[in-house]
From Swiss-Prot:
Gene, per the UniProt record: Nep4
Residue numbers annotated as active site: E873, D938
Binding site for Zn(2+): H872, H876, E934
Organism: Drosophila melanogaster
Name recorded for this polypeptide: Neprilysin-4
Annotated disulfide bonds: C277-C1025, C285-C985, C452-C700, C909-C1037
GO molecular function: endopeptidase activity; metal ion binding; metalloendopeptidase activity; metallopeptidase activity
Keyword Disulfide bond attached: yes
């Protein structure tokens, strides 16, 4: 049957009856047909797949297959993206390996350019870059163009067509959007860098060769400022203890708050897991190093350094604060200016007279001075005019008063009873000093600081000031091939450098004669060296330091202009020469007994002993006067002088000149810009372990405080110092003196004669606490620095002026009577001193701060802090050197032989005790011999301070309950010892420890605590330490 006949049979009848019976074979066949036309038995209609079987299958297949298909597509898509990312990462890794400094993104491209230029500037060839930089940028541009090509529609030059279409298709149809790198987003910048025409580059190179140094300098300044900013941010994050110190200077906080803060600080430093009877230093300071890691710009960090940091911040604020040109004291001089003074006192206008105003005033003053002759001529003409009869009559004849003036009450000016008529007439004229702000000592100190921190001016001036000075001194052979030895005389150069306060080859000064402390006399000694001690040159174990020193020399010379080969050759020669020089100096252990070194003679006698040196000519060049052969001098190194002239005769004059100039230039590079900082840092890292150079402002604070300490101290004392602390310290000093007298009476190894003389010496001690009074008197303070000219923009010349003034002032003391009331120590210093030839104790204002002292502290802390310091300095008058000087500061034998033997026996015990201590960090044993003076003072000071504290407790029984701190379960005596121990908390780098042990006369802080407390029966009693424990040994050493 044909298809048509089958179709016909399947059609329904006209009457709507079924064509076939339900049970017929035809019906069974129709149901079995899967895909085709058929009659739906229920409706009687012709349709595809009657019975819905096929439709169900058609619907089911897509529903099941579509999700599976989407999942497969997604997996394939992710695999493709992962492969592309891995390929991209590998390419970037390869690029970074071959160009490690090449950045990735646009802002990183611009980091390669000079400050102020952009990526477009490079494309337009407006800025010239080194070839290496241009190569890097070309590589970057090519790599970026390759990565970004898929996202740039229509461009397929750099890719295979199939690969580009595939990626572009993925980017348009993917279910997850394709991540576009941010450097490929539309930034308006053409991604393809134009090839740099080498010819154009060479043409532009000449055009911009003058601009390049400018850009490099700007980049260097920007980098330095960024480094300083980061350093300041780190410095700003000071510890709670340092913050408390700032609060102290600002007189902030209540009594209870201050005590609570101190208790919290002390608890933080302590390690309560350590038994105080085993190791009290670890018990008191166990957490110090964790809380105060050593700053990168320091070789060590201890309590003293923390206090100096706090004080430096205070001094910085004072020196950077703008000051009106005219001081308040000057403004007070006349009635008119009294008003200005009141405004000045109230602070109105403060900060408006900035540095520019000061400079303007200075220039105006100089302009007026330069026009002095013209002004005088004008004044003469004025006088002639007023002397004329008619004109004089016209000037002197008063005009008639108006009615209003007649009716007005008379004006009565305030009468100054202390002034006479002539004084009032003088007020009509501007005082001379009013036009000379440069005479103000405080302003000079501020200008010295400003000239030091002005990096822009220093960079602009470069090395020219230093080169000019070198030429004036006769030149530096390493820099001058034409240098001639015929014009060289080492004695003339040594005297000239001494005028700049530099002692090279010969040390000379004018000071009190140790055998006649009332007389100033010229004195000579052996030279110092370029490294801390002679052992650095002579001991093979110190070879690495000597190599670092030689490298330091060579790099400075090369930076100054010498060729690298010449610099290295000359540095080698100088190290060899200085090693010989070190060999002729006497070691420290041979110089302990100063009486054996002391030789007093006339210049004629000295000339006979060492005839090669023209002693009179040397001194005449320093004194600016004729010096006679009968002039008496003191010399401590006769043998050295004889060996020196022999060494110099055997040495090439060129080497001698190179060495002397090196020793001078080495210090002068500190007075130019920062170009030598990296060289110095490398050297000091090798010597002390310091990791970074200190910030420039810190260096400048130290320079100004060293060279103009009284001017800085006047600002500090006026603003911050509390005279109550001065009175408290003076009272405590008297208590400590009495404690020493009490101990002296119980000392059984001194005979009565020596005891009596020792007590007289204690009674005669001069006490200098806080500051000298003259610094608060502007005229006296100004006169001290009257001979120094300071310019706000000439740091190099300022330093030379200070050095010249210092040396001249010292030399001028010759033949003058010693003024024992004078202060030689700047007030803003964290230290204390004892002067043997003045029998004087000095406690500068800078040390009167926590943890040494606070007026709200319990007495236990003050006695354990500043009290121990007072006792320490007092005991220096009776240590191995101090005992040689009598009450007047003269050295002679005033002890009996039996008393000397008793002292020596006890001193040997101290020497042996400290010689048994080993510094574990470096494996070096302490030198008990060289540190005995300080160790004796430590032990004596602690005993006296505790004795004075116990006496105070007995005299103030009602205040015993107040001798505690909140949160610390300790008695007053225990707090005394704890504060003493924590004064010496600190840490040092290994290199710095080695240097300290080789040079210092103090024991490390750890042993100043352990050694002292293990000798104290008072400590053992207060902490209940069993006899025989490490901190309470059977054998104890004690001198005082």
């Amino acid at each position: 049957m044909s298809r048509h006949s089958q179709l016909k049979l399947a059609m329904p009848s006209v009457h709507g009856a079924p064509a076939t019976a339900p049970g017929s074979p035809m019906n069974a066949k129709a149901r079995s047909v899967k895909l085709g036309l058929g009659v739906n038995q229920r409706t009687g209609r012709v349709q595809w797949c009657p019975g819905l079987t096929c439709c169900k299958m058609l619907l089911l297949l897509p529903v099941v297959m579509l999700p599976l298909t989407l999942v497969l597509i997604l997996i394939m898509r992710l695999d493709g993206m992962l492969a592309a990312l891995q390929l991209n990462e590998q390419r970037m890794r390869d690029l970074r390996n071959s160009h490690s400094e090449v950045p990735v993104y646009m802002e990183d491209y611009e980091a390669l350019l000079p400050e102020g230029s952009t990526y477009n500037d490079l494309i337009n060839e407006e800025f010239i870059l080194p070839a290496s930089k241009r190569t890097q940028l070309q590589i970057l541009a090519a790599e970026r163009a390759r990565r970004c090509q898929p996202y740039r529609y229509g461009n397929g030059e750099s890719m295979e067509l199939e690969e580009r279409n595939t990626l572009m298709k993925d980017s348009r149809t993917s279910f997850l959007p394709l991540g576009i790198p941010r450097e490929c987003l539309g930034s308006g910048i053409e991604l393809d860098i134009k090839p740099i025409d080498e010819e154009a580059y060479q043409r532009q190179k000449k055009r911009y060769q003058d601009i390049a140094p400018y850009w490099l300098e700007k980049i260097r300044i920007r980098e330095r400022r960024e480094a300083e900013r980061h350093a300041e941010e780190a410095s700003a994050e000071i510890s709670e203890a340092t913050a408390a110190l700032q609060s102290f200077w600002n007189e902030e906080g209540t009594r209870e708050g201050i005590r609570m803060t101190q208790a919290k600080t002390m608890k933080r430093y302590m390690d309560n897991k350590v038994d105080p009877c085993v190791d009290f230093y670890k018990y008191a300071c166990g957490n110090w190093e964790r809380l105060h890691p050593i700053p990168k710009d320091k070789a060590g960090f201890d309590t003293f350094e923390m206090l100096r940091e706090s004080l430096d911040l205070v001094l910085r604020n004072l020196l950077e604060k703008n000051t009106p040109v005219h001081s308040a004291a000057e403004l007070r001089k006349s009635p008119v200016r009294n008003t200005l003074f009141k405004l000045n006192e109230q602070g109105e206008g403060e900060g408006e007279a900035d540095q520019a105003a000061e400079l303007t005033a200075e220039r105006l003053r100089r302009h007026i001075v330069s026009k002095r002759q013209l002004l005088n001529r004008v004044l003469v003409r004025y006088k002639r005019y007023t002397n004329g009869t008619k004109r004089k009559r016209l000037i002197e004849t008063p005009r008639e008063r108006t009615k209003e003036e007649e009716a007005a009450p008379p004006v009565v000016l305030p009468k100054d009873k202390t002034k006479d008529k002539s004084d009032n007439e003088e007020q009509l004229h501007v005082p001379t000093d009013f036009l000379k702000p440069h005479q103000d000592a405080q302003l000079k100190a501020k200008n010295l600081y400003r000239s030091c921190v002005n990096s822009a001016v220093l960079a602009k001036r470069g090395l020219e000031p230093l080169h000019t000075l070198i030429r004036e001194l006769g030149g530096w052979p390493v820099l001058e091939s034409q240098w001639s030895e015929s014009n060289f005389n080492w004695q003339v150069l040594a005297a000239t450098l001494r005028r700049y306060n530099n002692d090279i080859l010969i040390v000379q000064w004018v000071g009190a004669d140790i055998k006649n402390s009332e007389e100033n006399i010229v004195q000579f000694d052996q030279t110092g060296l370029g490294l801390p001690t002679r052992e650095y040159f002579l001991q093979p174990s110190n070879a690495k330091y000597l190599q670092a020193y030689q490298r330091y020399m060579a790099e400075v010379m090369h930076k100054m202009g010498a060729s690298k080969a010449d610099a290295q050759r000359v540095a080698s020669e100088l190290v060899a020469f200085e090693t010989q020089l070190a060999g002729i100096t006497a070691p420290a252990e041979q110089r302990l007994n100063v009486t054996k070194l002391y030789k007093r003679m006339t210049l004629d006698q000295l000339q006979a002993v060492v005839p090669e040196i023209k002693w009179r000519a040397y001194l005449q060049s320093l004194q600016d006067r004729e010096v006679l052969g009968t002039e008496e001098v003191v010399i401590y190194a006769v043998e050295y002088m004889s060996k020196l002239v022999t060494l110099l005769d055997e040495t090439d004059p060129r080497t001698v000149s190179n060495y002397m100039m090196w020793r001078f230039v080495r210090h002068r590079i500190n007075n130019v810009d920062d170009r030598f900082d990296d060289i110095k840092q490398s050297f000091y890292h090798a010597l002390f372990g310091r990791e970074e150079s200190p910030q420039r402002w810190k260096v400048c604070i130290a320079q100004v405080n060293t060279n103009m300490g009284m001017a800085v101290g006047s600002m500090f004392v006026s603003r911050y110092f509390d005279n109550n602390s001065k009175r408290d310290t003076l009272r405590m000093t008297h208590d400590l003196q009495q404690a020493f007298r009490d101990i002296l009476k119980t000392t059984d190894w001194l005979d009565d004669t020596t005891k009596q003389l020792a007590e007289e010496k204690v009674n005669a001690m001069s006490l200098k606490i806080g500051y000298p009074d003259f610094i608060l008197n502007p005229s006296e303070l100004n006169s001290k620095y009257a001979g120094i000219e300071i310019y706000p923009e000439k740091y190099f010349e300022n330093t030379l002026n200070v050095l010249l003034h210092t040396a001249k002032t010292e030399q001028a003391k010759l033949h003058e009577r010693v003024n024992k009331t004078n202060w030689q120590t700047a007030p803003a210093i964290v230290n204390a001193y004892y002067s043997r030839n003045k029998n004087q104790i000095m406690f500068p204002a800078g040390i009167l701060q926590p943890p040494f002292y606070h007026r709200h502290f319990p007495k236990s802390l003050n006695f354990g802090g500043i009290g121990v310091v007072i006792g320490h300095e007092l005991t220096h008058g009776f240590d191995d050197k101090g005992r040689l000087f009598d009450r007047n500061g003269n050295i002679h034998k005033w002890w009996t032989d039996s008393s000397i033997r008793g002292f020596d026996e006890r001193a040997r015990c101290i020497i042996a005790q400290y010689s048994n201590y080993t510094v574990e960090e470096v494996g070096i044993v302490l030198n008990g011999e060289s540190t005995q003076g300080e160790n004796i003072a430590d032990n004596g000071g602690l005993r006296q301070a505790f004795h004075a504290y116990q006496r105070w407790l007995k005299e103030h029984p009602s205040e015993v309950s107040d001798e505690i701190l909140p949160g610390l379960n300790m008695t007053g005596p225990q707090l005394f010892f704890l504060n003493f121990g924590q004064v010496w908390c600190g840490a040092m780098r290994p290199e710095a420890i080695r240097n300290k042990l080789n040079t210092a006369i103090h024991s490390p802080g750890r042993f100043r605590v352990i050694g002292t407390l293990s000798n104290s029966v008072d400590f053992a009693r207060e902490f209940n330490c069993p006899l025989g424990s490490p901190m309470n040994p059977q054998k104890k050493c004690s001198v005082w």
